[in-house]
């Protein structure tokens, strides 16, 4: 008999990570999208999270800081966009932005 592994991403872990982001970065929106939001994630699936907020400097450096401070206990693919960039990318048909905004689960905002 084989046991099914526990999922890497849990509701409680998502809540803790989101709270850390909100407390430290004040994002306008935090949205879970992809397989975790659709409910068809496997036990080893990561969490795809879109964060919409204003920030200075490089989005790469900001994402690294957010991951360091947020210290997720699960694998995460963090997509960071300024509000105007998210709107522009949505208009261009960006599949990740559209998936997040049209079908994602709002964790904050």
What are these regions (language model features)?
Residues 1-29, 38-43, 53-109:
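Catalytic core of pol beta-like nucleotidyltransferases
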